[in-house]
Regions:
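Short, Lys/Arg-enriched N-terminal segments with co-localized hydrophobic residues
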Residues: 1-15
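Short, charged N-terminal beta->alpha structural module
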Residues: 13-43
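Structural signal for conserved beta-strand scaffold positions within catalytic alpha/beta enzyme cores
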Residues: 20, 52, 92-95
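Gly/Ser/Thr-rich loops at beta-strand to alpha-helix junctions
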Residues: 23-29, 74-76, 98-101
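A short, well-structured beta->alpha microelement
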Residues: 42-60
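Short, structured active-site "lid" loops
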Residues: 61-84
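Ser/Thr/Gly-rich flexible loops in soluble cytosolic domains mediating phosphotransfer, phosphorylation
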Residues: 89-141
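Glycine-rich phosphate/pyrophosphate-binding loop and the adjoining helix
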Residues: 141-153
Length: 153
């Protein structure tokens, strides 16, 4: 594979450049269109950039990204790929229920938290504690909100 992903060293509070990847580009393009509309409506479009790509072309992206978020249907492709190919940028598997929520705040919060976790352990894909069994993940809110809700129970 051609390694052409540009990595933007993300710092907390910075703008966030996100690449959302799916198998054929269809569901990622729908998600990105919806999220970009939410960014525009909330006034955050100048602060964050979200784009999409097909799984097989994610290495050819020219924009510098802080994080790559993989749609749930790419899970099996990720398992078959050489994970050592991507070491310098966090790869985050979007939980299935979070993926269908189409809510920008949830995606941005998970993006920030995944970047922060990746900086501490440099493991790809990024899984939050207790979510390593990816296909069993039923979370539909951001991980930080999920954690807060568990504390309040």
């Amino acid at each position: 594979m051609n390694k052409m992903i540009w990595y933007d060293e993300h710092k907390d509070g910075d703008d966030m450049n996100i690449l959302i990847v799916c198998n054929n580009g269809c569901s990622s393009s729908v998600l990105v269109k919806r999220l970009n509309n939410e960014l525009m409506a909330s006034g955050l479009s100048k602060k964050h950039y979200i784009d999409h790509a097909q799984f097989m072309f994610m290495y050819q992206q020219k924009q510098p990204y802080d994080i790559i978020m993989l749609c749930p249907q790419t899970y099996h492709e990720w398992l078959m790929m050489k994970k050592d190919d991507i070491k310098d940028i966090p790869i985050y598997m979007i939980p299935p229920k979070l993926f269908v929520s189409f809510v920008i705040e949830k995606m941005l919060e998970d993006g920030e938290d995944a970047i922060h976790q990746f900086k501490s352990d440099h493991k790809n894909p990024v899984f939050f504690p207790g979510e390593e069994a990816y296909m069993k993940n039923r979370r539909s809110v951001s991980y930080r909100k999920f954690k807060e809700n568990k504390k309040n129970i």
